Amino acid sequence: MSHFPYDAVLFDCDGVLVDSEPITNRVLTAMLGELGWRLTLEETLRIFLGKTVFDEAPRIQAETGYRIDDAWIERFRARRNAALESELEPIPGAPEAVRALHAAVQGRIAVASGADRVKLRLQLEKIGLQDCFGEHVVSGQEQARNKPWPDVYLAAARTLDVDPARCAVVEDSVTGARAGVAAGATVFGYSPGGPGHSDAQALLDVGVVHVLRDMRELPAVLAGWQAR
């Protein structure tokens, strides 16, 4: 990887580094059911994948008559975090890929996620990657606009003092991929199949240049990538 083609690598977290979407959305499904909106886990994933609860607050209110407020979000996050603490596992191959890429770009890696910072720290610590990212963890909820706007990726590039156009982004959702593309980065997709990730064609349709099914392939794919 001596001639690595990117100055930095920016990772989404949920569904890229950690297999959190089924856990988070199971909790969300239960809590929406308590409000009267009865969904299957697959339906919840389809609606909320790559988004925050607040993104869909108008729809929740339309379906339940309940206006999502800060108190409800606090209860949701508490239940979600307890489930993540108990059950969370890394995406297979992700820790090894992160450490390999950390070495390839001399530590210039960052997390750029739409999730809240407490969740990000919990998840990175749980899978043993907090040390790799250090302070280079950016939450879209702390930006003026969250994904699909590019703000979180632009902010992550700034923390590393790199040009976004010289960054590779790794995403698994259409919402996140749109953000990376809008930031001017080269976006690679991860879509292993099954619920919890956008499908490969949907990612390609929004500007992703290549989709992986196995995260273990990521370092070699990025190292050998040439613009086509």
Describe the function of each predicted region:
Residues 2-103, 121:
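N-terminal helical cap/lid subdomain that shapes the substrate entry/recognition surface
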Residues 17, 90, 109, 169-170:
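Conserved SAM-binding loop
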Residues 46, 112, 192:
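Glycine- and other small-residue-rich loops at beta-strand/loop junctions that grip anionic moieties
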